[in-house]
Amino acid sequence: HLNAGFPSSEEGLAAWDRWVRTIAEHYKGVVIDWCIWNEPNGKTSGNTIEQATDFAVRTAEILRGIIPDARIAAFALTEADPKWIEPFVKELEKRGKAYLFNTIAYHHYKHNPDTGYEEVEESRRIVARHTPNIRLMQGEGGTQSEWCRNGALSNVFWTELTQAKYDLRRSLGDLGHGDDTEVFHLCDLEYRAVKRHYGLLRYGLLKTAGQADGFRVLKVKTAYYAIQNAVSVFNDALECLSPERTGSTLQGVENCVVYDWKDRETDTPVVVFWDASAMPSNDNITRQATVSVAGNPIQNPVWVDLLTGNVYKIEESHIERSEGRTVYTVPVYDSPAFITSQDILTLDQSWFVREGKNMKRYH
């Protein structure tokens, strides 16, 4: 339903209600996450906020009636647009219908994935003021692994490396700002009936063939392993700290971002950071920087590169203590890495290590 209008006739709405009821009953006990309508605020949709509110409420009432514990997202907006979100949540507040929804989903396509959070923050404040039970969720973000002529962020010479960096930065940036996040897409897509998106689009974590070749999986992309590395650490075992509870800083590289997490069981710090100054580059040039973390030194500290999954010991010569803080000298580049204790990580040694090869420490 990309940029499509809602059914509006009595007959059309009745058919929609039957379809929602049927699909909810079919997937009850299997599917818990539901999102109502893709990009209803698209420029060519012709939808008004009033229509969208009515439509979302009637759909959510059917879903909630059949699947009481469903997690329902109101829309998947083209962006976190405060001009769309504010009247929607005000109307939910007025009608007493906020309980129907868990989240409002938005899409976030920026060439530099670390830009554009201003409107997200503004929208979050609006939602918290009027419907505090609802959260924002980044519901579609990512980029392609090669040059493609169509789709969001198209006509750019992306590579598997820049895609992997982008997906990591998008995901950890969203989580760091307090929003749940999704990666678009598991596998490559082929559009044949949509003029604007015609052909193969390479957003997938898996590279697939087109319809003519049976949609075969051709390879596992770099981004697949990068996201696998990220979710193996940044999951419910960790807590992302709000800005007022964080204190880590980074010096030596301009325009870096730093997000503080902690292990829920041990309170061990997990500090993730990267160079956010530009869109991802097609090289891995690192620069040394210092990361200052509040409190005593981390036991058995390591620097972890999420792009590769490699874990490196931080030598004592790279650690300083000063006025209740610990400063670590580590590499920084335009892909996320983090500092934590090796004690909270479960390591899967590569064949290189298992075979007894010597690996050089980073410099």
Where are the regions that the model predicts?
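Flexible loop residues that form catalytic
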Residues: 39, 80, 109, 141, ...
